[in-house]
Amino acid sequence: MKFFALFIQRPVATTLLSLAITLCGVLGFTLLPVSPLPQVDFPVISVYASLPGASPETMASSVATPLEHALGRIAGVNEMTSSSSLGSTNITLEFDLNRDINSAARDVQAALNAAQSLLPSGMPSRPHYYKVNPTDAPIMILTLTSDTYNQGQLYDFASTQLAQKIAQVEGVSEVSVGGSSLPAVRVELNPGVLFHQGVSLDAVRKAISNANVRRPQGYVDSEQQHWQIQMNDELKTAENYRPIIVHYNNNSPVRLQDVANVKDSVQNVRAAGMSGGEPAILLIIRREAGANIIATVNRIREQLPALHESIPASIQLKVAQDRTPTIRASIVEVERALVIAIGLVILVVFLFLRSGRATLIPAIAVPVSLIGTFTAMYLCGFSLNNLSLMALTVATGFVVDDAIVVLENISRHLEAGIKPMQAALQGVREVGFTVLSMSISLVAVFIPLLLMDGLVGRLFREFAITLTTSISISLLVSLTLTPMMCAHLLKSQRPKAQKKIRGFGKVLLKIQQVYGRSLMWVLNHSRWVLLILAGIIALNVWLYINIPKTFFPEQDTGRLLGFVRADQSISFQSMREKMKNFMQTINADPTVDSVIGFTGGGRVNNGFMFISLKPLKERSENAEQIISRLRIKLANEPGANLFLIPVQDIRAGGRQANASYQFTLLADDLNDLRKWEPVIRKALGQLPQLTDVNSDKEDKGAEMAIIYDRDTMSRLGINVSEANNLLNNAFGQRQISTIYQPLNQYKVVMEVAPEYTQDVSALEKMFVINNQGKAIPLSYFAHWQPANAPLSVNHQGLSAASTIAFNVPEGYTLSDAINAIERTTTELRVPSTVRGTFAGTAQIFQETLKSQLFLILAAIITVYLVLGILYESYIHPLTILSTLPSAGIGALLALELFDTPFSLIALIGIMLLIGIVKKNAIIMVDFAIEAQRNGNICARDAIFQASLLRFRPILMTTLAALFGSLPLVLSSGDGTELRQPLGITIVGGLVMSQLLTLYTTPVVYLCFDRLRAYPNRRNCCRQFEHGQRGKTGTYT
């Protein structure tokens, strides 16, 4: 410790060093981004392919299957799922967390290129991919509404102007536009007139396609001039298309306007967005990985006035949802808890030392250690988030411990009359190794967590590094700044000048005396203490096995997601009305601030909602209670169900479901899956541990099965390709031409007019022109019958899959639900051909359950190795670690008492306790070893004297850690769900540990000393009880 004597003797250098640490920390703080949780990027890529008009089964067999075969060969794919619906296929690839997303994207593009030749020729565009981060919810949603512009025009404004400008804002990664589609010219055919005129639908398609072409025409050069050739070969509007001649009948032209209604509309009329139940276009904004979410939202808001000016005045642009208010409030709450924690630990120091000057020393040392941590956080690319700020709050109790141990020991020498400089040098020399052991062993606790891979390792790496950095800086400060300030701020006291003990000091003296007498009794009955310690270890195991467990505390972020599932045969118009009814009911609730949503696309019977709740201080219910109440109010809508889940800051897995957790059934034989899925879903729906049980299996959609008579077709001169073209042209919203404009490209869409497709009689009006030019009705060579057909076909890997989604009701935990599902599937005796596996968050939870015990054991073993190296002993580390069972039982009992499930946050609390509670044992054992080595006294005398002599710093450090964590327990604002489990675990563990380890540690120390000395140990201290009576020390 001679090195640190230089800092005590050079106050200017030490002061400037501390100032430099503080200034760098302040600079780092201003540069740190803000986010709700540490950035955890799941490498997920989604592939999208479309074939308008194709059935889900056709999309699955002709598009999804060849793509899956190609994509499944990519290295590092953990899971591949696909969902094929009407006209579209989505394939989601979840890669290993260590896989670089950019490298994976290149492999995906190569696989798509390789599979291109196997895909149908009629696809309007090649399959494309986009990167997805399932853990990152939208940071802001804007809406566009207008009384004068239609939805297509609003969508055009949003996609061509607003989305481009918002995407250029620093921190924005993606702007998605939803609620409608781009403008288009729609050609709505009249089948009766076409038949009367003898014009086939394919003839109309070819006429339109040939009338609108864009090809280079070239140029003409003369000796003096150059001319470009430009022709009127493009048609831009519906008015331009109406005069097109599609056929001649008796030398009279048949124009498009004669056989169809040609109008300016949108590409997809079966898509709708709403805000508060009224039509709206949605701009969904996501941030870049690692971007400051609050700064990004602020920059977007700064751009809003300019965006308003770029669009017509009759268009209203509004912020419908902003993710940052709850994040701001949560960060403020954690910062408030941090300030309160600092104040409480300083109060603890003042109560024990009763000196303003002595209290000033940790009041300076603690902020220097905490503020300096911001520098390391910035250099490591971390952010200010709930976990990193919680780490600093908890660290408040840790960093003051080092200062307390040094300060208390120097104060003891000053009370003995030693001069300040000498007291500082001697005090650091005596406890320097103790402080070093405390800090290094605490840092060692987090080594396994830092080396851990997967979600848990990624999520808590910032927490661990932030905490270990603050502890490391605290170690430096406690051995440099703290003793230097003691040497120059504190004064020595002559023994005769000591003040009379009174007030809090008198209370502490009484407590110490009681402790001394009780410790003597315990040392005389050590066998009972060892039996109690064994019982505590057994109780720890029982409590850990039986305590309810969950993955992550359920957060109230002020946002809900709504999933609407209607009857599978519902029309788009009816679905839109049901969405409107649901949204109006939700919007009328006093706790709801806004609701927006959309429906349509490949699954007409599905809808999606974003719901913003009022700030927590303006409502008396949490998100889960609001969902329970709304569930009852929304249950009366016939033919449709609305599932609500609270939005979480962390979500595992790339799949989206109608509930928070998923259980997937896989089968190689689709018939097995169809047989067992309803049975399992019904059984799970009856379990009290589950609610909102639903499945993505939709195989009851209404279908009209058309059966060709191939012999008749051959006789009539018609082939299958012509018949299929007829149906696609009539009912598939077929995109038959492209309109090129300076800002965008628009489509010409053709189908039979809606008034002729209200029922199956529309098929009777369809006809084909055969090879002899005659109009042959579809009914001549085909018949049809109603049937059930899937609205979606789902795969996982290359197996047929069906996902059962569920939520967990109040009063139960995720572990309860998983155990109930596993028990039920076993009782049903599901055959081995149908496999059940948990997905998403439930799957990650199962994986973390397996690693939790390993993580705790690894932390204990690491601490043992570090302590063994520091003490050059196999025995003393075991004595120090004997404090852990009492802390564990305190933490688990506290969680049970507060009805809080054991989660990842509680696990971190347990690991922190491993580092905290052993400090008491280190302080006692270190002094006992020193006393035995230098004082030539027996182990019993040494540990007794160490326990009494170090009673005050032990009590001070424990109370400092306890009060540092107390604000987390008592917090009540935004983000409480994350903070309370950590605080409850630490406070419960510290209270129980303080009550028990003051007795168990001396007993274990003596027990190991006897084992080590056996069989030649001496029977020392025969007059121990008589000689030590009254030796309990004093306070001044």
Swiss-Prot record:
Compartments (UniProt record): Cell inner membrane
Record's keyword annotation contains Transport: yes
Membrane-spanning segments: 12-34, 336-353, 360-382, 431-450, 463-485, 528-547, 853-875, 895-917, 949-971, 986-1008
SUPFAM superfamilies in UniProt: Multidrug efflux transporter AcrB pore domain, PN1, PN2, PC1 and PC2 subdomains (SSF82693), Multidrug efflux transporter AcrB TolC docking domain, DN and DC subdomains (SSF82714), Multidrug efflux transporter AcrB transmembrane domain (SSF82866)
InterPro entries in UniProt: AcrB_DN_DC_subdom, Acrflvin-R, Multidrug-R_MdtC
UniProt-recorded Gene Ontology molecular function terms: xenobiotic transmembrane transporter activity
Domain of life: Bacteria
Bilayer topology term: Multi-pass membrane protein
Keywords, comma-separated and alphabetical: Cell inner membrane, Cell membrane, Membrane, Transmembrane, Transmembrane helix, Transport
A single Gene Ontology CC term: plasma membrane
Alphabetical list of Pfam families matching this protein: ACR_tran
Protein family per UniProt: Belongs to the resistance-nodulation-cell division (RND) (TC 2.A.6) family. MdtC subfamily.
Alphabetized HAMAP family for the sequence: MdtC (MF_01424)
PANTHER family referenced in this protein's UniProt entry, alphabetically: MULTIDRUG RESISTANCE PROTEIN MDTC (PTHR32063:SF34), PTHR32063
Subunit annotation: Part of a tripartite efflux system composed of MdtA, MdtB and MdtC. MdtC forms a heteromultimer with MdtB.
Name recorded for this polypeptide: Multidrug resistance protein MdtC
Originating species: Photorhabdus laumondii subsp. laumondii (strain DSM 15139 / CIP 105565 / TT01)
Lineage per the UniProt record: Bacteria, Pseudomonadati, Pseudomonadota, Gammaproteobacteria, Enterobacterales
